Amino acid sequence: MGMFCNQCEQAAKGVGCDIIGVCGKNPEVAALQDLMLYGLKGLAIYADKARELGVKEEKIDYFVLEGLFTTVTNVDFDPVQIAGKLRTCYDYKERIKALYETAYREKNGSSAPQITAGPAAWVIAGDLEGLVKQGQEHGINTHHADADIRSAIEILIYGLKGMAAYADHAYILGKKDEEVFAFFHKAMAATADPAKGLMDFVGLAMECGKLNIKVMGMLNEGHVAHYGHPVPTKVPTGTRKNKGILVSGHDLRMLEELLKQTDGKGIDVYPHGEMLPAHGYPGLKKYAHLYGNFGGAWQDQAKEFPHFPGAIIFNTNCIQRPADSYKDRLFSWGQVGWPGVKHINGWDFSEVINKALECPELADAPAKEILTGFGHNAVLGVADKVIEGVKAGAIKHFFLIGGCDGAKPGRNYYTELAEKVPQDCVILTLACGKYRFNKLEFGDIGGIPRLLDIGQCNDAYSALQIALALADAFKCGVNDLPLSMILSWYEQKAVVILLSLLHLGIKNIKIGPSLPAFVTPNVLNFLVENFNLGPITTVDADLKAALGQ
């Protein structure tokens, strides 16, 4: 059984994974994820039509987010779990179809036109083997016969996947938006419309970037409403003597619930990877047993997790194939899944807690502290100092160096870049790419740390607010600021953040360590001509270009 997947930066040979995914995804799971996209297209076709008649159901709207999130890199590898979601997808498609047909009949006095082919007419197979066969018939290469149009469709779909992840987090925090739900349906339905051309999908991709700013803003509002604005916070990177639970992922609401349930039980809760910024939120840092930051970025988990003796839980990506040395201590939650790993449904984490209590304690092993919590509220709180520093010449340039980390060789570029940034420049960072350099010493400029950790990948929203505020203060556009964006990417959330930046007209962005395999030469030329988007080259050359030397 073969497969083809090219959605992440680690696409084999820079083309795509066709035997097994570098991420660990096998052909069976790849086929089921392809079928999920196909099924969601069918659901979206009817949901879009129903919405035009004023008919909608929130549970169906939310499922589209869940379904797309399921197909994000390093989220769900469990075929049984995905098969269950496919059945839900089919049931919801049939339900919204029936609601649409009823509304159409009531409005027009006649039956709705029947759709007899394509994803809207999909009939689900009866067993797992049948689902896999269906998925194999609807892979990436079936999106469109024209390579450039297919590339634009993929950019749109991967942007939708990234936005779905953020919208899912926001929804869990009570933030939702009708315009966002409607766009998911419109855009997914469009990907199945043979009448749509290249510029239609370019336009939809830009619209996706625009709406993602709204979604990231909703998520920011949800975080702030629940936990307050992040504040600069020192975080120890060592361990202390106590039982422990390691939390990996991005979902702060899940972390909060775990902190509540572990309070007073002699268990420390350690953030891993993108959970590090939790320490900056007053509503989370008030828990004394939220402690430390164990390990580095996601791709090092196989080396690091065997050395964490407690329970481990993933609440979003990035999960990798677990080693036997810790698989029996590993749990998944939300959209995450791996065969043989215990999945926690709902908000009762007693199984995780009991496992942690059974496990050995961590040792007292003090280590250096790192800083986090420099969201836009904190940075703009000292904006006068920043502006004064720029005007006085103490701060010559800002570098946004961040994004996803990964295992592919070449990512040491970002370490070297951060190290070589001149002493009169400030580095903004976010997402797990920060682990390439966040334990290095950078000093400060007039009391302002030279390295400012803005937060998670979704806190690109904060980075944008900082950039827009600086542009306003200096009465110029963002492109006129002494600001360079040199980003690392890995999966689909990075794609939608890039679309958001492009929607704002931000130019001269460099991305790496390699360009997406799903971008054809013609589509790349369009991005270069319109946005001067380009790949990283060498540290010295890119620094000279950024500093105008």
UniProtKB/Swiss-Prot annotation:
Listed GO MF terms: 4 iron, 4 sulfur cluster binding; hydroxylamine reductase activity; metal ion binding; peroxidase activity
An annotated GO cellular component: cytoplasm
Subcellular localization: Cytoplasm
Residues that, per the record, bind [4Fe-4S] cluster: 5, 8, 17, 23
Cofactor(s), by name: [4Fe-4S] cluster; hybrid [4Fe-2O-2S] cluster
CDD domains: HCP
Binding residues annotated for hybrid [4Fe-2O-2S] cluster, in chain numbering: 250, 274, 318, 404, 432, 457, 491, 493
Gene3D superfamilies per UniProt: 1.20.1270.20, 3.40.50.2030
Co-factor note (free text): Binds 1 [4Fe-4S] cluster. Binds 1 hybrid [4Fe-2O-2S] cluster.
Gene Ontology terms: biological process: response to hydrogen peroxide
InterPro entries cross-referenced by the UniProt entry: HCP/CODH (IPR004137), Hydroxylam_reduct (IPR010048), Prismane-like_a/b-sand (IPR016099), Prismane-like_sf (IPR011254), Prismane_a-bundle (IPR016100)
A Pfam family matched in the record: Prismane
Catalytic activity reported: A + NH4(+) + H2O = hydroxylamine + AH2 + H(+)
Family: Belongs to the HCP family.
Function: Catalyzes the reduction of hydroxylamine to form NH(3) and H(2)O.
Protein name listed in UniProt: Hydroxylamine reductase
Highest classification ranks of the organism: Bacteria, Pseudomonadati, Thermodesulfobacteriota, Desulfuromonadia, Geobacterales
